[in-house]
Amino acid sequence: MPRPFDPMDVLCLPLMANLATIGADGPRNAPVWFIWEEEALWMLGSETSRSVARLLADPACAVEIVHFDNAAGILLHLGFRGRASVEPMDAPRFRRLLARYLGPDESAWNPWFIKEIAAIDDPGGRWIRLVPVSTFTNNVSYFRSGPALAWPR
């Protein structure tokens, strides 16, 4: 029995999103960092990434984000469906995304990671943008406390 919740309760957390796409050889799933801005989910990609290539061929996709805290008994499931677009990199948005996951103090970010992996100013960087056509939420935070919900407290 679905128990809805406000999607922002999950979207505001630095969690991993799972991006599901379809290719010629079947479905694929990729864990991605994300940021919610302008009523859209923005996920990292690059011009050479397979997720970007699959979405350019078929933009239909699904995204699942789960907030799970076993000890606290929290299990929140957020799902989006829709058609994604591939957008050019926007360095200020990328910095905001990095601040979500690495903290607001850029001087504390791992310089090797920023240069070699994040490559903020790389012209090959892309955003995968999903404006959800459908949204599903389910608060299953009763597996330890049921039938009462462990969240919200």
Residue ranges and their predicted role:
Residues L75-R153:
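Charged, gly/pro-rich active-site loop segments
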Residues S51-D58, A62-P88:
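Helix-adjacent hinge/juxtasegments
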Residues E47-T48, A62-H67, S107-E116:
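Short acidic (Asp/Glu) patches
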Residues P7-M8, V52, A118:
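Short amphipathic alpha-helical segments and helix-helix/interface helices
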Residues S46-R50, Y101-L102:
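Short, solvent-exposed aromatic-acidic interface loops
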Residues M1-A17, L149:
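Extreme N-terminal tail/first-helix region
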Residues P14-E47, V63-H67, L76-G79:
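Short beta-strand segments
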Residues R28, T48-S51, D122-G124:
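A short beta-loop-beta micro-motif enriched in histidine and acidic residues
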